[in-house]
Amino acid sequence: CALPISEYNKSVREFDLVTLDRVRRIDIEPKLSVWQDYARAHRLHPAVTAYLELRPQHFYKIENDVDGVQFVTARGWEDLSAYLQAADRLALPVDEGVIGQYLRHPEVARDFAAYWVLYRKYHEDYGVEDILQGKPYDAVIARAMDASFDERISLVSLLLAGLNTRFADARATGAVTDACYQQLRSFKRTLSQQPDADPADLFAERCDAYRAKLEADKTAGALLPDEAAARTRTLALLTAWSRSLDNGLDADEAFDTVRGAFNTQVQRREEAVSAASNALEFAFDFMEQAFEDGQEMVVFVNELALGPDSAPFLAENDCERFEQYSEKLLLHGGEDELLAELQRDDVRAEEHSAEF
């Protein structure tokens, strides 16, 4: 049996003893580390996740005072993240008043509003994009080394956000390229099976079939957002290639035309992967100079290992320094954490052994 806490839901009622004797009780408490996994997988705004790393006590709060209930919950953070992402795209205002519409706790809303201003300022002051492009950054190294812990962690979050944009672009471009490759293979097979048909018509039919399947899957809700975006981009490319085919081309000429366009897409994928890999190397250069083996590097490597965009990219593209730091900072840390948890379990067992 699981019920929401009474502070959050007034419809909660206490069970009588007879009922309690017949149900299993599980106490559930909000846990930031679990929610951070969710936030990472759903790509919540990095300012939100970075702030909560620094202010975990603000993740979930419900308080009563003379003005009524003041609260902030996981749902509020997620909704705020969605607004911040829209604000980044559309240049919408972000101030304490807007933030307070999502974080219904004035103290937390005020604190996050102040952090948001600093977060944006750090992005400009440190020239995060310049760092990721390999431009000189000697002027900000000293500041990073002398910065407060909050500022250093915020800078790491900004670097990761810039990298994740590149990782996501490389993944999306790769997915589109792979989908186009499958269509070209099928097109080549169809050309050999129907030698008398017009190649341009055959490719147009293939585009129509791809479009119909995409629309059907969208209507059925069978596609995740990333899949829908990749297939939509694939359809746009296939349609453009179809328009470049003139009626009257023979099979070899038609296939060579489409293959030439596909090779351009392959080059785009290689450029996207190269841009992401180079940015990662530049980020490691900066991290090593600014933070060496500090806690900031642990956070940086851990987020790379767990990110929904970074982890697949690193699985497909080697990065020697990531492997080195993963082994040095993460693996041993995981063993230590496991041993510590086992020790805590032993202590709990000893504390409660008298009850039995």
Residue ranges and their predicted role:
Residues C1-L3:
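Short, small-residue-biased leader/transition segments that mark boundaries at the very start
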Residues S6-E7:
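Conserved Switch II/interswitch segment of TRAFAC-class P-loop GTPases
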Residues K10-R13, R55-Q57:
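Short amphipathic alpha-helical segments, especially helix-boundary/capping motifs
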Residues V12-S33:
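A short helix-turn-beta junction within AAA+ P-loop NTPase domains corresponding to the substrate/partner-engaging
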Residues D16, H45-T49, L224:
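Generic structural signal for alpha-helix starts
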Residues W35-D37:
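Conserved beta-strand-loop-alpha-helix hinge in the C-terminal portion
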Residues A41-D201:
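Alpha-helical lid/collar subdomain of P-loop NTPases
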Residues I141-F356:
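Terminal-proximal interaction/regulatory segments of ATP-powered molecular machines
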